[in-house]
Amino acid sequence: FGVYRYGLHAFLVILISVASAVLAEYLFDLVAKHPNTIRDGSAVVTGLLLALSLSPTVPLYIPCIGSIFAILFVKCFFGGLGRNFMNPALTGRCFLLISFGSAMTDFHIDGVSSATPIAALKAGEAVDVAAEFLGFAPSVIGGSALALLIGGIFLCITGGITFEIPLSFIVVFTAFMGLFGGNGFDPVYLFAQICGGGILMGAFFMATDPVTSPVTRKGQLLFGGIVGLLSGLFRVLGSSA
């Protein structure tokens, strides 16, 4: 949907991000004389998730740098898949946000520089919740809440992920925003908070990383709740939306 919404540049961001991740892993295995691991698909997933978390207007060198950092410094240098102590895609995004902050937070779309729905909420402005839910509000490439929900539910049904982490993440985040977000438990406000700012992507696709998340049901519920709480804290107290 992000490619449909944002066009060729968004497609190139995704393509470069995935290709850079795969190439970085291939070259590392070649130089280190390790068995080739690109066929497991994890590099593709890392590149795709990183690309979907980026602004559709980022310069094309940014997804390349982010994917290479994620694969080499977060995954390969720690022993490869199953040994990384952080989510590669999420860590790559954090690295890019620190290194290229202005480009990462620029949503200059259709010739107009627009605030994201979450930035508008923090400023006390009205938000088009329907546009945010469907993915037509200024956001990252993978910012359609509807598409993220469909993908997340599909993964839960097919066993790709378990429901405990997303459920506890969203429940705790929603409760925190209701208590401390400044608008009480207004359903429209809470719905807008859930649909924006990467909450659904984090709940379904980042926090559920099988390598860096707990394996027991209780651990998953606790982990999801803690991440949801931290997301609420960052949303309320953080300077960046």
Where are these predicted regions, by residue range?
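C-terminal ends of transmembrane helices
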Residues: 22-35, 71-82, 150-160, 204-213
